[in-house]
């Protein structure tokens, strides 16, 4: 969950590319994180990107 939390922090501070990288790492560790991310307001700027992930 640390990678997920760091992704949230990066997102709310406008560091979108860093947020994507950290979220990708979190999803690689636990696929269920993708579902959590789509419900987290901190990650709203990434929702389209998350939806497009394979």
Q: What feature does the model see in each segment?
A:
Residues 25-26:
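Canonical positions in the second alpha-helix
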Residues 1, 35-36:
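Start-of-helix register in tetratricopeptide repeats
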């Amino acid at each position: 969950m640390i990678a997920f939390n760091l992704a949230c922090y990066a997102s709310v501070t406008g560091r979108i590319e860093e947020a994507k990288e950290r979220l990708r790492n979190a999803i690689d560790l636990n696929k269920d994180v993708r579902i959590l991310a789509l419900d987290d307001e901190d990650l709203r700027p990434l929702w389209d990107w998350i939806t497009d992930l394979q």
